[in-house]
């Protein structure tokens, strides 16, 4: 069975890695950030969903990021997977329409991608101020050699074997990373775009690509620019047009951006796609990210953030990266020098240019929102990635040299001594406990604590150091946590208790603490194997959260509480994000807790609960969102009259004749005459078709549990043309009724339509549905060939095929006949009409399209119940029918649905109505079914306690006659 092997958390989402390296996701999907729609009224995924990514055996998840707009996964082999919401703007993600991609099969045969830029762009942007920023042309003749060398060098370094794959929830089988889709660059501003080559991958900067550089020229940096340009032999055209920044005005230093490509390939619009390969490091902040690859830095911004994030960046050139018609953009930061080495340092990228002795820091600064920032400065002190720290709040860099501290000031673009440590201060630079992108400077002198951050609420001045407190525990302080009504001071002291109160503050000693994490209004920590939550909030419903609380202490402005998590077993590991903690208990059990605010959190309906992977992907492989059975447009409507007194032909024979007689562009309606009763509409039509299909089922198929095989003796009596018409009949019933067939055709038939052999995952899906007990028995032998042979099978795959009744026998003649009949049926099935979105389906989804679910979805049926009438007891009646539906066996529920709707399929867009009729005492009581309107009419006097058992018996007895 699938077991959880690793857990990653970020924001409001959880990523799970299974024992077979499959990836599952759960959490916030409000804006489709997980890559797919799960229903208009459901914004959270409350149990793990397989996202159709299975990593290679030698690959693993390195990092996981999520935000409101998209989700990203970075692997140890350098692959970045992005949810498609990144390029869909967080809007509605539509199911893929395969009919609009005629000829796209050829595109998927090989990967190709060329990146270029039009000469028009080069000419139009030369030395043209954009937003009052002077651009320096690096495409002048003096720079041609350098540009070619850079292009060649990158082309050599970046391999052409990167594959972009479409990954979606439920809708396609796992593909190997070697599979790829063709990518063709189209520069919409280039009239000769049709002639662009297609030999490069996304990341290859081809020679045809024009690099453009933009530098924001600030006060006192003209010398630096001159040095850079002279080193690169660049003609400093426009260098005198220096933009002088008004004193005190904030300006981002980001300024050297070039477009990195434009691609188009065939993929579906749901789920995840492989964005890049061979990526070294990622810097993620809120709703954008940078990544390093082959000593270059790239910037990626989701669709909805383009304008807001790039308004201060120049030059800004539109690029059209198109995946299945959706545009998106990413950018390359091109330095005006050869970068020797780019390092990743927690919250920034760093590179040093030895020729000019300039240090360069690339990160994000926060000014209401986050924006890209490029900081550069010259310094003679020894600086490296280990003694440099970046603050996003002030867009500043700290450098710690011994106990002296230097700080880069954005207002004068220089590195200056910030702390002249003549007093031998103990200087500590730590990430902010709540905002890891922000650094805090703590200085300790005896029992006095200072900081450059104004914790006390006075007017901030970045040039001053503030005294924070005087306390005996100051020498042991390693962090501060300021909450709305109390302060938690983090200390590390072997001689202190875990929690000590002093001077109106809480001192939290982590010396013996194995885990602690600050959340919105408290701290969760692990102490001696028990998990506690320290907060000033009194939790009203502790039982829901499985907590036991007590009042810990009184402070001047608040009361502090401590809550113990009541867990069924000891904690093995803890994973956390800003919104969640996930606990791994002994025995490989996992529990999640949304902890931003225990008292008001409504993120998950269950609030806290156990996480487990659904066994064997039984519920994970079918993607119902891309199923569309109404794929035909009918030009005419033909009315068919059927009299039940005429017994010359049964329903199957009538439907078979009808299939041969009607044009495939004609819609038919059924009018059934049964003695004096006349029925017409969708209900009688569905009932007639299902009756016909069932008659075919009993004659031409051999039934097992769910799966079937052909009755070869009966099929041998049919001509090839007749078998093709049978296939057309099946698809006609599906499309005309907008419903699946009431039977399950042999798996070989679905495989023939699908055009590919089933994967092991897909075979497991079918085998488990056919015989769950037998499947659980053989699953442990999946990776044990010897054990499989002891069970009497050649291989694990052979065992699965036997359970599925698919191509499993040694009888070659039987397999050949089955294959032939499937080909003929599939030809007729396709001839009637195309299957919408078939290219996005995996085999279980196609099987669902044809035959529907294996089991009736009671949850949808109950949620879509609508009861009217009997107003005084309406709620009581509704609850009674819900309990009744839940109590039925699968066969009884099928009979009820057949009576109610003329079909055994439950559709999420249907409303199932129960109408309570009030009549006089003298009126005859009864139950009537209205299949067209999906209604059951029940006389209220039948619902008293004396008749209720009779009502239930009638509901699950096949109905005679109809009301339509």
Swiss-Prot record:
Which region is the signal sequence?
none
Task: Note down the stretches annotated as region Disordered.
Answer: 97-208
Q: Which residues lie in Low complexity bias regions?
A: 121-148, 192-203
Q: Extract the SUPFAM superfamilies matched here.
A: Hect, E3 ligase catalytic domain, RCC1/BLIP-II
GO molecular function (one): ubiquitin-protein transferase activity
Mark out the compositionally biased spans (Acidic residues): 97-117, 149-163
Cross-referenced PANTHER family, in alphabetical order?
A: EPHRIN_REC_LIKE DOMAIN-CONTAINING PROTEIN
Protein's name according to its UniProt entry: Uncharacterized protein R349
Give the organism the record lists.
Acanthamoeba polyphaga mimivirus (APMV)
